[in-house]
Amino acid sequence: MLKTKVAVQVISPGMLPDDAIMLGDAYLRQWKIPQGQPLTLKFGAMRQYVKVVPVERFDGMRIGQSLARKMGLLANTTLRIRYRPEEAQLALGPLIGVLISRDDPEQRDRPFGSITMFCKELVDACEAQGAYVYFFTPLHLKGNYNTVEGWVYSDGWRKTLLPSPDVVNNRLTSRKLENRPNVQEFIQEVKIRHRSTVFNEKFLDKPEVFEALAKDPSLIKYLPESHVLKSFPMLKTMCSRYHTVFLKPVRGSLGKGIIRITKMEADAYSAQYATVGGTRRHYFSSLLKLYGSISGKMKTVRYQIQQGLQLIDIMGRPVDFRALVQKNETGKWVLTSIVARTAGSHHFVSNLARGGTLSTVREAVGRSNLSGSSSSEAPGKLQRAALDIAHGVDNFIPAHFGELGIDLALDTSGRVWLLEVNSKPSKNDNTPLQDQKIRPSVRNMIRYARHLAEF
């Protein structure tokens, strides 16, 4: 298999037969492409038999307007080209499709709302690496999965019809959208019919992650005791073991709906609720009365009950860490970034949506109440934990992931704990602490897509 980058030019009608392409003769000589014999030209799911016309002193590809339109190829695009002699196939790509939650055609400058800049970063990264990306929503999936109507960027955002992609990056931000029949049908069809790869193909529930990772003895050290809360006896047992426990919605995000339960004097308990404006606290004379106050919520919200941890803090504000791990150009997990998140005043969760602030790991650890010897070891321990956990997710959860947001914590003895694994990490939450045009996380995403598509 041979591959390189090539500039694709679309030429006027009549200059080239519809079943022919022009290619620099150096490619034909180097790759021993037979002249006069038809090849299969591939772009995403689209395939077309073509004859190759060699052109001297030319290092690009020329394709007629009619064939380019049929293949979904845009003019003046630099792509990677791959030749497989055993299949007599010339492929252009990779063609990457990003499945997003919604679009707004009326907002031409910001058709994807708050993630528009992230989408433009992907476009720029693809241009630099010789890939092509488009964006589509569940509403664009109409049943013919050979082609998809999607958004492309060429001097502005516009919609066009494109082949189904080589690689799909699932960036849907709601389980309701992800579970739509047309989305699930599309994912299965492109994987089976077109041999496309879909990564980050599903959301992760908290109990699913903890139960899976507990199968690996080497990962148990990172796992606070956790269970799905089903009854009062379970709450009573956990509260007898730990001074503080947390109730977290199984399918929650951004710190929404978390309840911290703390044992007070005698048999009294306090329950603190995370809200946008701060923490709301209620007191109960018994654990049974506290349970009665949440049992109504439990009819509609499943909770994970988790061991409370004595986390490091800065002036009483808890600190945790968000690691972004991604697969690289060889398919191996690497740590792309890790940042510290310090809870806002009057909050016990650190999410930015709840007033948290970002800093580097070393800065946060250095300002925290962690002892000096543990503090110097903390960055390395956090990095190792993030990669260990990513491998565990790969090994024990039957789904394909290319990036994970892993929330970690340090207790006051310097031990690393897992809080949560997110298969759809928010791009805002992972904003680097330095300003760059294209984030490393975006470059890595394209490199991994190239690896999957073998470009």
Where are these regions (language model features)?
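A short beta-strand motif that forms the metal-chelation/ATP-contact edge
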Residues: R322, L408-S423
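Conserved N-proximal alpha/beta basic substrate-recognition cap immediately N-terminal to
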Residues: R110-M234
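A long amphipathic alpha-helix within ATP-dependent nucleotide-binding catalytic cores
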Residues: S285-A409, P440-F455
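Redox-cofactor binding/interface segments in oxidoreductases and associated redox assembly factors
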Residues: V98, N169-N170, L247
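Short beta-strand segments enriched in small/hydrophobic residues
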Residues: G93-D104
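Glycine-rich phosphate/pyrophosphate-binding beta-alpha loops
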Residues: R341-V349, N422-T431
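Short beta-strand-centered segments at strand-helix junctions
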Residues: L2-L92
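Active-site nucleotide/adenylate-binding loops and adjacent lid/helix of ATP-dependent enzymes
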Residues: L2-M22, R29-P38, F186-R193, T197-Q306
